[in-house]
Amino acid sequence: MAALDSDSDEDLISYGTGLEPLDEGERPKKPIPLQDQTVRDEKGRYKRFHGAFSGGFSAGYFNTVGSKEGWTPSTFVSSRQNRADKSALGPEDFMDEEDLSEFGIAPKAIVTTDDFASKTKDRIREKARQLAAAAAPIPGATLLDDLITPAKLSVGFELLRKMGWKEGQGVGPRVKRKARRQKPDPGVKIYGCALPPGGSEESEDEDDDYLPDNVTFAPKDVMPVDFTPKDNVHGLAYKGLDPHQALFGMPGEHLNLFGGASEGTSHLLGDVGLSKGRKLGISGQAFGVGALEEEDDDIYATETLSKYDTVLKDEEPGDGLYGWTAPKQYKNQKEPERDLRYVGKILEGFSLASKPLSSKKIYPPPQLPRDYRPVHYFRPVVAATAENAHVLQVLSESSGKAGQDVGTHSRHQLNASKRGELLGEMPIQGSATSVLEFLSQKDKERIKEVKQATDLKAAQAKARSLAQSASSSRAQASTPDLGHSSWHLALGGGTVTTRANNFKPFAKDPEKQRRYEEFLVHMKKGQKDALERCLDPSMTEWERSREREEFARAAQLYVSSNSTLSSRFTHAKEEEDSDQVEVPRDQENDVSDKQSAVKMKMFGKLTRDTFEWHPDKLLCKRFNVPDPYPGSTLVGLPRVKRDKYSVFNFLTLPEPAPLPTAPVPSEKAPQQRGSDKSRKPSRWDTSKQEKKEDSISEFLSQARSKVGPPKQESSALGSKEEQAPEPRPDTTVDKAVDAQTDGEGSRPSMDLFKAIFASSSDEKSSSSEEEQDDSEDSQEHTEEASLKGSQEAAAGETSVVLAAEPEPCEPATPFPIQKAQIDEREEFGPRLPPVFCPNSRQKLEIPQKEKPKKSKERHKSKKEHRRKREKKKKHKKHKHKSKQKNKKSEKNSSSESTDSSDSGSDDGGPAELSPQELLRRLKCLPLRRQ
């Protein structure tokens, strides 16, 4: 048993790497998931997938590039003594271990070579080697190499030899009879299909009789069949020129086109030197060639492709006149007269036909019958019911064709019970098939009454809608069901007159329309010969039948368009929850003004739309323009939501702003004018008069109605308006006041310049200061003259306004003047909304009487500035001290001016307004639309 165990152990072969045995009580480790596995080399280091030849940049010896060890070697070993041992390095010496591994660029793996080939070398290759040896400078030099090199046999060759196979024998089971050799007898000639005599075979058979029975022979060796596919268009066994040798060979090389293929094969098969008796030595021409003579071309034995055309060219004239390939136009020139008679152009390479073409036989068209209709009209399909049975009968009889029996039904209109009744079957007594069968008789009668009432209401509603929809003159064809219902209503509802009056399918032919209306009247009466009575007897039978069909189809299918549309539309199933709709913000209230301006033919700015449009950021980038709204997230027109169904959407009321020439109360006017003058608005600020003129809707309402402005009554000013007299204000005084306000508003006050440019004006050079002093001297005289004029105008203005009471008057300024004013105001862009600053209340309360005091204070401050500048010229060395003094004096002057203005307002100003009154006035101010 022990011996058997040892033998069995020796016979076992282990494959792969065995697992490490587990200790007792130790659990097997869990497999590591794929994402946690790492690739390591044989030394346990992380493998990096890059090397000198495997892609990526080498990071040095163990990735030490950039470190101290990577730049300087740790130990220096001289290689001077090992110079003799150096050998030629190959690519493998520069490769890493990864490159020589299984997945590298030069894996060291077992590769199949010639030793493991399935067959020996080809005989043709061996013969080629023999030829190379014969043509070598030293004949037979390659034979020595063949003697030295060992014979290489494949593994299959060795296996076959061990199995008893020998060269020249076939592979397979051995046979008993000997392979016979068939040698043809040269003296025997064979004629026809006769077989040769079998004398030689009989002699061989006699020889086979002497062989013992237990002798077997190897099978005959079979030559392998060449299964190379034919992938060209040449003939079988054709071998043309080698294009590589012919086109890319040396210019001195020639192709031997006349050397036979047998000679080439004989070279490959051997016996070259022996059969032809080739002598080795110098071969050349028989006669010598002089230095100045050229060698004759061997035109019979050599040929080059340079003598042939390699590019397709146009045929030279006259080349096609000769040879059997010439076209027929050169050969057949016997009938030139026929070609000359031909008018058209004969194409090159073609000639006129000698025989004419056979003409096609054309048959006449068939004759149409007299009652033929080129268009097929489909008859209206009317369901055969008890209600419209007489309609079907009238239609069938009037058209001259016998209609089908009303009682007969098609198979598609019958159910199982009706088919059973026709066949005479007894109905099956079983459970009730309908819920109505379980109801009592009273319930059934009540349901029937309700159904009749609903049917009656539906019929009345349809008749009413048909009568209402008779307003449209165009008729539309409907479905057969709709046509049937309208037909029934037209016959039974008494609406024939409305149909005849409104639906006129034959309006172009009044006589035909009249006959059609008569046909409808007779149809309503139920007369069977309605069509025959209406038709014209002078017409032919074909026309009468055609008109009969048209009348029947028109009476059936023509329904009013309103009833057709009402049957196609239903009420909405779901209502929208939102009661608001989005509209463009700038188009919300301008519709009525623009429409009225268009009616008055006042085109231009009144009908022009200005939208606030937010472009996309990409659009600004494409056109290289700055984004006008950089912080906006909107794209397009900003929209606001308003109520869908609101009464105010359809109202176009003018704004409650007063007219441009509307007067103000006597006490309110000086306060507002004084406040405007004291505030010194810039060119961007607009007065109330300009705001009133800017309202387009009010201007249009004035031009339309020529009425006064809406009166604004206030509780605080009502008593003062009643007490004031009513003389008409002088227009010349108002014009002077307007001119004065415009002149003063054109240039802002000096206080504004002081507040902005105070620090920068002190640091200017002395030369600029001298020029400013000269200019200020000239300005003083003009300002003093203007002050006197302004004081006088203000005094006259106050007296006139106090004595006068406002009276509504018509606008006197025409539209062109107003348009010019709007253009001047919008010269620097659109107007800005009015600014309400916290100090506006104090400025509004300053009366107009304090204006002269302010102008005097300004002159005083200017004189002080002038004196200080003169001091600066004298004391240029002490600039810092003078700057401090100037700042102190400026502060004192500004404080004095503010104190004086406050004291003036306290002394001469009216009582302060309450916050409620000020808020009410601010709400009454008209808003400007931009």
Curated annotation (Swiss-Prot):
According to the record, the residues making up region (Disordered) are: 1-41, 170-209, 400-420, 465-486, 566-596, 654-930
Question: What GO MF terms are annotated?
Answer: nucleic acid binding
Gene Ontology biological-process annotations: mRNA processing
- Which domain of life does this protein belong to? Eukaryota
Ranges of residues in domain G-patch: 152-198
Do the record's keywords include Acetylation?
A: yes
- PTM-bearing positions, type N-acetylalanine: 2
Q: Where is the composition biased (Basic residues)?
A: 851-886, 921-930
Q: Where is this cross-link: Glycyl lysine isopeptide (Lys-Gly) (interchain with G-Cter in SUMO2)?
A: 313
Which controlled-vocabulary keywords does the entry list?
A: Acetylation, Isopeptide bond, Phosphoprotein, Ubl conjugation
**Basic and acidic residues: bias regions:** 582-593, 674-695, 719-737
Give all Phosphoserine modified positions: 6, 8, 358, 715
Pfam families to which the protein is assigned, alphabetical:
DUF1604, G-patch
Q: Does the keyword Acetylation apply?
A: yes
Biased composition regions of type Low complexity, renumbered to the chain:
465-478, 894-903
Q: Which GO terms describe its cellular component?
A: catalytic step 2 spliceosome
Q: Where is the composition biased (Acidic residues)?
A: 1-12, 768-777
Q: What is the similarity comment for this entry?
A: Belongs to the GPATCH1 family.
Q: Know the name of this protein? A: G patch domain-containing protein 1
Source organism per entry reads Mus musculus (Mouse)
State which gene encodes it: Gpatch1
